[in-house]
Amino acid sequence: MNRALLVWGPAALWAGVIFFMSSLSQVPGTSFLDHVPAGDKLGHLVLYGMLGATLSRARRLQAVPYAALVLIGALYGASDEWHQSFVPGRQVSAFDWIADLVGVAVGLWLAHTFFMERPMNPVASMTPPPRPGAS
């Protein structure tokens, strides 16, 4: 399997989901967010938190610095806000972009906190290390 696809594929796929959703004038299934204080920002936080979590694979598999991953997420969020300026019924908001940025950072932090310390191959972690002197 192509290593670049393994490292960046999940983030690219999720970025595609975000692009698709922001292409819609009204995102289905989100009307409940209208009744939640700052529900729109919560939606951005969750979507971009998932992007941050998928970007964390690059940190784990290629040692990409966190600052670079946050920058990638921030630039994607800015491009998504610009993209929304062409979608009827959508508008550009700096506050949405800030929610995107915070979401990426929180997603990276959560992925690091809960998954970075664990081995990627759970079977390998169950294999006991060889004993000294044993052949």
Located regions from the model:
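Membrane-interfacial alpha-helical segments at the cytosolic side of multi-pass membrane proteins
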Residues: 47-62, 66, 102-115
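Membrane-interfacial segments
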Residues: 59-63, 83, 87, 91, ...
